[in-house]
Amino acid sequence: MKYLCLLSLFFIGSLRAQPVNTLIQQAEQLERQLKEPEAIKLYQAVLLQEPAQVAALCKLAELHTVLANTAVDKKTKKLMYETAYAFAKRAYAADSNRVESSYVMAMASGNLTDFESDNRKIVEYVRDVRYYADRAVTLQPNYGKAQYVLGKWQYEMVKLSVFKKAAVKLFYGGLPEGNLDMAIACMEKCRQLEPYMVSNYLDLGRAYKENRNPTKAIEILTRLQKLPNRNSADAIMKATGAELLATLQ
């Protein structure tokens, strides 16, 4: 045990000795290899040197979301989503004018809506998704991920349960209704800007299905199956898309 502790301290010390740019490059390489836990360690090492390094904070929010999406049990999913949210908040506090900071705040807020039992908090998360998504699109209209999260918000508002809609009305007097045409428009724009974003294809296929356009849903979900896996959660999302596709054929 003592040996392992010393080895761990040596490892951390060696990481801290490396330049931030080198650590980020190594972390990005690990991401390309779908080694998210290892990449997370390097981004955390960046924060040991620069606690407000926005790029690292945003990456940590995204990578913990990937871990949540691959987790089997609900407890682990919630923990990873909460961790992602914490890093997103730090990123936004460090630089609220970075489009990536607003994007990860919208993403992380949306992830927590299904894991929150307090109605007031659910509504706050729903409102935050729209606020930060709008802010991200305003900062950079051609940031594909921002278009995706805004489109997903529109879709989710259409699909919002009666219970959650009642909570929204109770605490805030309601929110704008979701619009499937707007959801599809945003996600189609994301598809142009981020042609390999698996989650966008999956939700776009769902939106077309909900909008009673099975032909387009089949087209999108078929293309989804041909996309490369760019993170460990992509294979799971593609499998979900394949199941949905099977119901349409």
What are these regions (language model features)?
Residues Y3-G13:
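Sec-dependent N-terminal signal peptides
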Residues R16-N69:
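N-terminal leader/linker segments that initiate helical-solenoid repeat arrays
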Residues L30-E38, L63-N97, V104-N142, K152-C190, ...:
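Short coil/linker segments at helix-helix boundaries
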Residues F163-K169, E177, E194-P195, S199, ...:
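Terminal, low-structured helical/coil segments at or just beyond the last alpha-helical repeat
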